[in-house]
Amino acid sequence: MDSDFSHAFQKELTCVICLNYLVDPVTICCGHSFCRPCLCLSWEEAQSPANCPACREPSPKMDFKTNILLKNLVTIARKASLWQFLSSEKQICGTHRQTKKMFCDMDKSLLCLLCSNSQEHGAHKHHPIEEAAEEHREKLLKQMRILWKKIQENQRNLYEEGRTAFLWRGNVVLRAQMIRNEYRKLHPVLHKEEKQHLERLNKEYQEIFQQLQRSWVKMDQKSKHLKEMYQELMEMCHKPDVELLQDLGDIVARSESVLLHMPQPVNPELTAGPITGLVYRLNRFRVEISFHFEVTNHNIRLFEDVRSWMFRRGPLNSDRSDYFAAWGARVFSFGKHYWELDVDNSCDWALGVCNNSWIRKNSTMVNSEDIFLLLCLKVDNHFNLLTTSPVFPHYIEKPLGRVGVFLDFESGSVSFLNVTKSSLIWSYPAGSLTFPVRPFFYTGHR
């Protein structure tokens, strides 16, 4: 009867994934419990919501607290297993006929209390076996939590690096075509400059593409090393107390060294190549713009939406108290118009044109078709440029000083210029602009 009860008790404390005692146990929504490391590895590639490994029921929540009750019960079960192991004749001290309850850190041996105080071992560090094992197991779990965060961070970077490499070629092809179209509007004498501009663009494309490829390979290799280390730590945690203490070695130091030199994503950036006469030509259509300023609590989610798009996460809470929006007093519906705005003192900004209907909406979304905007967002220490309709990244250096906006209703296009560099940032394809618009400016300090 006692044997049946003991077997049933052990079964309830066993993870169905690894078939060992639960380590850092968590109980998910359906009521089943697993080792946190086992669940992390099981759900690593799963889409949200993930399914329970036991009953396959969807689990909308993926972040759980440690089940303290189960953890304490597992500690009791481990203690019982340890005492069963120590009760064998082999674990009785031949000299003092006492149970070997102490562990010597120096020679990794089990000692009775009297031997641990002897002249031979007196200078060594020794601890009660169960206390030492639990202490080291907790250190391993702490290291695993750190390691898992790095695994996830590296996985996100790996995905983003692959995505950037995929977008990179298409981005450069579009930029080359845009540059050709712009030179067609200028004097034929600039043909040599156009050729040099495109050659420089192609050279930068090749160099940065190789950087992206090398970076992706490094991240992929680091991902394998991190997971191998995580698996090794997990296997160590699952070992019985005595085996854990004897086999521990330098595993913690090795796991710390794996965390060093984490590969960082490449921030690809093309040089803003000048186009002779670009700003001079557009200045013929220059207009003065006056703005109606709007209070900061207007429900505009431009930067939050773009950050969500960039990092493929849910809406991010962002303090908008330092942002303000402004709309042009004048509506444009025909002709050609050019103006400039100063963005030198802003970290995050958006400028361009929008439809009146977009302004009136309660929640202005960045993926709306009623706006043609150039956005600049600071993420960590890097500035990202994007345009809307659709949301599209531009891997080109951030403009300093003034940005030019050119409306051309004859071709149905909107263009953005780096005025300081006399460079074209982006020009929408002909036929994109088909409705009346007014200037828009949104800026802030972060």
From Swiss-Prot:
Induction description: By DUX4 during herpesvirus infection.
UniProt KW Hydrolase keyword: no
Domain B30.2/SPRY: 269-446
GO cellular component: centrosome; cytoplasm
Localisation: Cytoplasm, Cytoskeleton, Microtubule organizing center, Centrosome
Zinc finger extent (B box-type): 88-129
InterPro entries in UniProt: B30.2/SPRY, B30.2/SPRY_sf, Butyrophylin_SPRY, ConA-like_dom_sf, SPRY_dom, TRIM/RBCC, Znf_B-box, Znf_RING
Keyword Coiled coil applies: yes
Record-level GO BP terms: innate immune response; regulation of gene expression
PROSITE patterns xref list: B302_SPRY, ZF_BBOX, ZF_RING_1, ZF_RING_2
Keywords on record: Coiled coil, Cytoplasm, Cytoskeleton, Metal-binding, Zinc, Zinc-finger
Zinc fingers typed RING-type, residue spans: 15-56
Function (record text): E3 ligase that regulates nuclear lamina integrity and the association of viral chromatin with transcriptionally-active host chromatin. Acts thereby as a herpesvirus-specific antiviral factor and mediates the ubiquitination-dependent proteasomal degradation of PCNT.
Protein name: Tripartite motif-containing protein 43
Species: Homo sapiens (Human)
Lineage: Eukaryota, Metazoa, Chordata, Craniata, Vertebrata
